[in-house]
């Protein structure tokens, strides 16, 4: 059974509901937040009527893995996501098990820190038309899915109406100031390279990913927040499927998007997914977890 929504009573207060996560404050830990990853799934900006069982758990456990890998290299907001370490006020809610992260509150920077290691998706479309990626000059003659000589930092910001808006990297300093902009750009690429190398040894190519950062206002240092290197925030390819000239299928919602498109349901609300699509999508997420962590899915 997929968990589509949460509703925690006092001492919790729900402060935000995203496409996947519910965020809570709690009077017992006022400097922290509770992130709960539900099993909701969206495509083409619409949330499906039914979810993907265990998806929220997979996202949480993959993020947990990457926070552990990256914490020597960057400050993070994660206090714990391990059930046995969470306070009783949380663990008395059994439905939250393995899908909850207790995190420190930080001021969030209004930047989506996207790093691209390979030319695919919207970057490939722009390159075909203009020969650039996010307005950046890149080598001529590149083929689809080819690796860039060096990973590109291609940020976006939230426009007033809530849609992501691509911006040139130079624009970031106008939004957060030059010091934080430099930290975000350099740290994003550094973290991507570390994760890319870890994943490649496990048979996965991270084509691109999105990081989000807060700032520790006592030190003015950036802090890695939100989910990290999951199938929802990244494009994962099987290394065994990879050839330059064609983008492989990814471990994300591409299977779902393909089904919606084939059935003329893309960009339509209130879509219920058939059981075979739900299960095939669930398997994709679980496979990503098992390959990345090297562990059998058991949650």
Swiss-Prot record:
Supply the alphabetized keyword list: ATP-binding, Ligase, Nucleotide-binding, Purine biosynthesis
* E.C. numbers: 6.3.2.6
Q: Would you say which domain of life the source belongs to?
A: Eukaryota
Q: One Pfam family, short name please?
A: SAICAR_synt
Q: Native species of this protein?
A: Schizosaccharomyces pombe (strain 972 / ATCC 24843) (Fission yeast)
Gene encoding the protein: ade7
Family, per the entry?
Belongs to the SAICAR synthetase family.
Matching entries from NCBIfam families are given as: PRK13961.1, purC
**Protein name in UniProt:** Phosphoribosylaminoimidazole-succinocarboxamide synthase
Q: Which InterPro entries match?
A: SAICAR_synt/ADE2_N, SAICAR_synth, SAICAR_synthetase_CS
- Pathway membership, UniProt: Purine metabolism; IMP biosynthesis via de novo pathway; 5-amino-1-(5-phospho-D-ribosyl)imidazole-4-carboxamide from 5-amino-1-(5-phospho-D-ribosyl)imidazole-4-carboxylate: step 1/2
Share an example GO biological-process annotation for this protein.
adenine biosynthetic process
Q: Which GO terms describe its cellular component?
A: cytosol; nucleus
**Magnesium keyword on record:** no
Q: Which catalytic reaction applies to this protein? A: 5-amino-1-(5-phospho-D-ribosyl)imidazole-4-carboxylate + L-aspartate + ATP = (2S)-2-[5-amino-1-(5-phospho-beta-D-ribosyl)imidazole-4-carboxamido]succinate + ADP + phosphate + 2 H(+)
Single GO MF descriptor: phosphoribosylaminoimidazolesuccinocarboxamide synthase activity
């Amino acid at each position: 059974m997929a968990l589509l929504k949460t509703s925690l009573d006092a001492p919790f207060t729900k402060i935000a509901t995203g496409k996947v996560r519910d965020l809570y404050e709690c009077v017992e830990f006022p400097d922290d937040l509770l992130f709960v990853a539900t099993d909701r799934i969206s495509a083409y900006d619409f949330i499906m009527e039914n979810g993907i069982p265990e998806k929220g758990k997979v996202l949480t456990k993959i993020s947990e893995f990457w926070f552990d890998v990256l914490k020597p290299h960057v400050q993070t907001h994660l206090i714990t996501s391990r059930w046995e370490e969470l306070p009783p006020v949380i663990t008395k809610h059994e439905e939250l098990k393995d899908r909850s992260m207790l995190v420190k509150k930080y001021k969030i920077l209004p930047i989506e820190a996207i790093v691209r290691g390979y030319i695919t998706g919207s970057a490939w479309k722009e390159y075909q038309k203009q020969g650039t990626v996010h307005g950046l000059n890149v080598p001529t003659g590149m083929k689809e899915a080819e690796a860039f000589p060096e990973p590109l930092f291609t940020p976006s910001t939230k426009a007033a109406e809530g849609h992501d808006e691509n911006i040139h990297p130079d624009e970031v300093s106008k939004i957060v100031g030059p010091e934080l902009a430099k930290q975000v750009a350099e740290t994003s690429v550094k973290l991507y390279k570390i994760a890319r190398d870890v994943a490649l040894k496990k048979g996965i190519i991270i084509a691109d990913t999105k990081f989000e950062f807060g700032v520790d206002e006592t030190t003015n240092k950036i802090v890695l927040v939100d989910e990290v290197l999951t199938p929802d925030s990244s494009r994962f390819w099987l290394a065994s499927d990879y050839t330059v000239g064609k983008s492989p299928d990814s471990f994300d919602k591409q299977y779902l998007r393909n089904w919606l498109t084939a059935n003329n349901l893309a960009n339509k609300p209130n879509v219920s997914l058939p059981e075979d699509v739900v299960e095939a999508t669930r398997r994709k997420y679980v496979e990503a977890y098992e390959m990345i962590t090297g562990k059998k899915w058991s949650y």
